[in-house]
A protein has these predicted regions:
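Conserved catalytic-core segment of nucleotide-activated headgroup transferases in glycan assembly
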Residues: 63-77, 219-297
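Nucleotide-activated donor-binding/catalytic signature segment of Leloir-type glycosyltransferases, i.e.
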Residues: 94, 98-104, 281-310
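Active-site and donor-binding regions of nucleotide-sugar-utilizing enzymes
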Residues: 17-218, 222, 243-245, 258-262, ...
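Acidic donor-binding loop of glycosyltransferase active sites
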Residues: 122-126, 304-335
Length: 429
């Protein structure tokens, strides 16, 4: 299978520029930088390579956020970092957040000659793969060029595992190219490594690594125009984070119920996608709720039940401004949940729904520690009211959530130090 893949990648190699130009027309590529994916127009490499150049191959925005604290740690210890990702959103995030000593480049396409150009230019000593997919040419080319290979947070979706097991021999061969494989301690699919006879070690979820960076947002508050005497922070307030269109009726109903039972209540909603705000507004108004949007510039007052935060990048400010954080994407099946660590890092009680496939390992651990509330869509109202009516319970959940997040955030630094020592010890043997 691998030989066929490599042959086909050579055959379609001349077509790759046309593929990227088609994506460019759809707005999916950076017009000034898309050639980086073809091994061209790279930024200047490091004049001083410090302790060595390390390559982090991350899929997209989520993976970029998860490895940023690790990158910061490595840079502070004298390493130079090249981070490659494939999406525009991840590129923008890294542009604004990478430390000096780290650079972002768009990921090379899975073509041997392109990958060799990348390695020749940047001269990395190791590849850290932070992906849910294996790229045969990437793995084999890096190995042949003498790089150490680390599969960090290794996991495969059910669809990916099913696909690869049709070619188990090739799958096993690729996995055995890695010097180190680390998978989440709670990853239920880890038996794929056992079935392939591949050695691996367990680690805490990479999502925990984000916590240290999130704590820097503690002082951010939402800049809201309010009527004289009205202050959201003094109210019983919640924020629904990353709500989806399929959850709008659930959110609207919950707010209606809470408003009827809890005095001085106001809800903020920071939807996952801004273009859903019009339908969200309609669903809220259909429940008889008085709604204002942040972009309207209208003053928020005690007459309002809901403030829709129809702007990007304000979730930390919303969390700090309100009392309880309700993390959406988890109240209907099929989405998989969103980041529950952000409100935990900011010392807020956290409520999430029943459908958190993407965060099951973290939520299970938080439930064991009494650090989160898992609620059905029908129980949101009751859980919110209980928190505001019982201040000691409110403080307990906020404190435990924060303690859990901070404790877990430290495990990755120790792990990375161990990996780096193992990599360079192996190279010196």
């Amino acid at each position: 299978m691998i030989l066929i893949y490599q042959f086909l990648s050579i055959v379609i190699g001349p077509l790759l520029p046309f593929y990227l130009k088609a994506r460019l027309k759809k707005g999916k590529e950076d017009k000034l930088r898309y050639n980086e994916k073809l091994g061209k127009n790279y930024p200047a490499t490091f004049t001083d390579k410090g302790n060595g150049v390390l390559w982090f191959f991350a899929a997209s925005l989520g993976e970029s956020k998860s490895v940023l604290p690790i990158i910061n740690h490595l840079v502070s210890n004298g390493y130079k970092i090249v981070v490659t990702t494939g999406t525009l959103t991840s590129a923008e995030f890294l542009k604004n957040n990478l430390p000096q000593g780290a650079i972002h480049v768009f990921s090379p396409l899975d073509n041997t000659s392109i990958i060799k150009k990348f390695i020749k230019h940047f001269k990395p000593k190791a590849l850290f793969l932070v992906e849910e997919e294996l790229w045969p040419n990437l793995v084999l080319t890096c190995k042949s060029q003498g790089l150490k290979l680390v599969f960090l947070g290794a996991k495969f979706s059910l669809a990916s595992s099913t696909k690869w097991f049709k070619y188990k021999k090739s799958f096993t061969y690729l996995l055995k190219q890695f010097d180190f494989i680390y998978t989440s301690a709670k990853y239920q699919g880890a038996d794929v490594f056992d079935l392939c006879g591949v050695a691996y070690q367990k680690m805490d979820s990479l999502k925990y690594a984000q916590v240290a960076a999130l704590t820097s947002n503690k002082s951010k508050k939402l800049d809201i125009c309010c009527e004289d005497g009205f202050d959201i922070e003094s109210k019983n307030s919640v924020v629904f984070i990353s709500s989806h269109s399929s959850e709008e009726q659930i959110v609207a109903k919950a707010i209606k119920q809470i408003s009827a039972k809890l005095p001085n209540f106001i809800a903020l909603i920071a939807p996952r996608h801004i273009d859903t705000c019009s339908s969200l507004l309609q669903n809220l108004q259909s429940q008889g709720l008085n709604v204002v949007t942040l972009s309207s510039g209208q003053k928020v007052s005690s007459n309002h039940d809901v403030l829709i935060v129809d702007a990007m990048g304000l979730v930390p400010s919303c969390i700090n401004t309100t009392g309880v954080s309700i993390v959406c994407g988890s109240f209907v099946d099929g989405i998989g949940g969103h980041n529950i660590l952000e409100p935990a890092a900011l010392v807020k009680p956290v409520i999430t729904g029943e459908f958190n496939q993407n965060f099951d390992d973290i939520i299970d651990a938080m439930l064991e520690s009494g650090a989160i509330i898992k609620s059905s869509s029908e129980a949101i109202c009751g859980d919110v009211v209980k928190l505001f009516q019982n201040k000691s319970k409110y403080k307990e959940f906020a404190t435990k959530a924060n303690e859990f997040a901070m404790q877990k955030s430290q495990s990755h630094i120790s792990l990375i130090n161990k990996i780096i020592n193992d990599i360079f010890n192996k190279q010196s043997n």
